[in-house]
Amino acid sequence: MNPGTITNREDFLQRIAKQLGREVKLTPPKREYTHRPQDEVLKGASEEELLETFRMVATRIHTDLVECESAKLDDTLRLLIERYHGARILAENDERISAWAPTTSETFDWWDSSQPEASRELAIRADIGITIADAAFAESATIVQYAMPGRSRTISLLPQDHIAIIPKSVLVPRMTQTAQQLATLDRDGLHSPNGVNFISGPSNSADIEMNLIVGVHGPVRVSYVLVHDL
């Protein structure tokens, strides 16, 4: 028997079932939750209430939050890049970025999924990584990024700073709504992402004395750019 393997499982279960006087049930029963507190968090909150919660929590997790309309996104990105003294910018390969910021994005490097090693080198040297959030949670000021070609986790992890563009339309109360969406994709046989990344501001670490250090395991600074009309 190889380590970590299970043998004779069916025979074992058959013996137990026989002693209990019933057949072996191979399909697990569907269990309904008696209580579903996850559905009650921010239930019935208005769009403005979700946004206000998101603003408040973003401050707690040491994240800059900038808000603008799509017409001002180009200038907003430029000013943020200047504030962070960014000279080398790496963006995920999403045509929406160049469409929303045609002038500022002219100097960006773009993630090339056909050349992952070269793209990783760009990420290592980049001052800022720019991505687009697929969802955002008001409860924890967490953003969600789906992993797929051209949209590597490396872009938001290796550069010194990270700027995430958040269309306001993707703001939801909490993780529950995104989990339900992903479950629907799997259940309906639709294409689901290769991976799901949850990002809650810059990386944090604390020692036994609770001295907080920001930016040890990832970006030193994270900025959310929330765009109201997207």
UniProtKB/Swiss-Prot annotation:
<dbReference type="InterPro" id="IPR022823">
    <property type="entry name" value="LutC"/>
</dbReference>
<protein>
    <recommendedName>
        <fullName>Lactate utilization protein C</fullName>
    </recommendedName>
</protein>
<comment type="function">
    <text>Is involved in L-lactate degradation and allows cells to grow with lactate as the sole carbon source.</text>
</comment>
<dbReference type="InterPro" id="IPR037171">
    <property type="entry name" value="NagB/RpiA_transferase-like"/>
</dbReference>
<dbReference type="InterPro" id="IPR003741">
    <property type="entry name" value="LUD_dom"/>
</dbReference>
<dbReference type="InterPro" id="IPR024185">
    <property type="entry name" value="FTHF_cligase-like_sf"/>
</dbReference>
<comment type="similarity">
    <text>Belongs to the LutC/YkgG family.</text>
</comment>
<dbReference type="Pfam" id="PF02589">
    <property type="entry name" value="LUD_dom"/>
</dbReference>
<dbReference type="GO" id="GO:0006089">
    <property type="term" value="P:lactate metabolic process"/>
</dbReference>
